[in-house]
Amino acid sequence: MVGFKTLALHLAAVLPALAAPVDKQATQVVPNSYIITLKQGASAASFHNHLSWVGDVHRRSVSKRDTTGVDKVFDLDGFTAYSGSFDAATLQEIKKSDEVAFVEPDQVWDLYTLSTQSGAPWGLGSISHRKPNSTDYVYDPAGLGADHYAYIIDTGLDTEHVEFEGRGTLGYNAYPNSQFIDKIGHGTHVAGTIAGKTYGVAKKASIVSVRVFDTGSVTRQSTTAIVLDGFSWAVKDITAKGRQAKSVISMSLGGGRSEAFNAAVEAAYQANILTVAAAGNSAWDASQYSPASAPNAITVGAIDVDNVMAWFSNYGPVVDVFAPGVAVESAWIGSSHAEHDVLDGTSMATPHVSGLVLYLKSLEGFASAAAVTDRIKALGTNDVVTGLEGTDSPNLIAFNGVTA
């Protein structure tokens, strides 16, 4: 049953912006927790030696107190980093290392979802028609996404939901001591828009769930390091299975701008793994947030049924395209495994574009991340979004190219 859902997870992220996002994010730093990115070209041996050195420095520090040292390690082709909890003395030694490119604080990340009431699933009509207010989804059956994969970095997935017809799998849980299940609903809703049999853009695509939000958190928040852990797993899994040309990473979440996370997104892009990211719900410049600000992510803002930019949507030149993000109906969690509900947010706009990536990959056979990005921008409907005045945003709506 479609009903009213409250998933406004962090009020500061959904209210109209009255101050610069730097001020908004200032209270979102995880105490004593940092992400350290090494300079490009670090060998496996030098990385191992660096980590050993950090461990020694931390153990010798008389002021380490409750800090735990290195916690997570991130090792992708073109991106080498680690996260952990360090005292000031250890951190200072790390910063002085010639091997270190930059150090940044770990930050709190949020899901980009708001509250809404019942409505119609108009989003599929929007991406298959140039004119607004269509509720018919027109598509080429060859673009349904069979043998293609959506890696959804989110809250988990109801794999038994009827929308997914057995195409959903549980890939990686960044909270190993917590059950791999979607008790929040956000990840299931996103997955339904990408690949659900009723609500999905790419209705036959497979779903790989990467869980980076814990159900035990009242505020439903995560951190840069935890999300980066899930992202790194997804990149490695795609690479190991040779799925670069058949996959997309979908991220309906974000936090304060992170150079480390943006570097990881770029490393994935250079390996032909495309990331689609939500612009954010702060009604502010998306360049202040990650992964929205990653240069080669496809960053998605939200519009309503009349092609008006949503009041909450982040904006600016880092946004690549707009998509339906107001009153979006999709799959939801529940004991019947057949629930559905309606939500607002750039979280809801993003999976429309993630699904479109898989649709175009399966239909037109794009092998590179750059090629499918260019195709989405070329197909988009130009100059029909209103409410963009003064935002320096592209006036472009995602479109699948089927109708005139």
Swiss-Prot record:
One of its GO terms (cellular component) is extracellular region. Residues 121-404 form the Peptidase S8 domain. It is an enzyme of class 3 (hydrolase). Residues 20-112 form a propeptide. Glycans are attached at N133. Residues 33-111 form the Inhibitor I9 domain. The active site is at D154 (charge relay system), H186 (charge relay system), S347 (charge relay system). Keywords: Glycoprotein, Hydrolase, Protease, Secreted, Serine protease, Signal, Zymogen. GO terms for molecular function: serine-type endopeptidase activity. Its main location: secreted. Its EC number is 3.4.21.-. Belongs to the peptidase S8 family. This is Subtilisin-like proteinase Mp1. It comes from Magnaporthiopsis poae.
